[in-house]
């Protein structure tokens, strides 16, 4: 319902939000809006948490992914396996250690790019409250009380 499609709009979900953010930063072409859906936001997590995630992934990828998919689901979710793309260890490492930069967000605003962030209060993947607090000074934040990571 909120995803907009257009020539001057960049959007991304979860890890894809990091990719969309970097694309908007690096783009020489016109960008009017950046939409971030449940952006991967782990910069408030400690190093131990991140190391454990990577260790569990390396030890048993299938069990890690099964647990991850279970955490994605909420009451309204049907099957999500068809939409899931397995990532690599390197991608998980990038996702966990990515730092959203206030300076980069300010740069996007200076370029005239409107930023929208969509978060679910019941998200079991990221700390959506921390993400809301971080993004609210740079973006219009939509915080859905009854939604999880999949919104």
PLM segments and residue spans:
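Gly/Ala-rich beta-loop-alpha elbow adjacent to hydrolase catalytic centers
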Residues: 12-20
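Helix-loop "lid/cap" segments that line or gate small-molecule binding pockets
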Residues: 52-56, 66-78, 94-95
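Short alpha-helix in the alpha/beta-hydrolase fold that links the catalytic acid
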Residues: 113, 127-138
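Catalytic histidine-centered segment of alpha/beta-hydrolase-like enzymes
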Residues: 124-125, 141-151
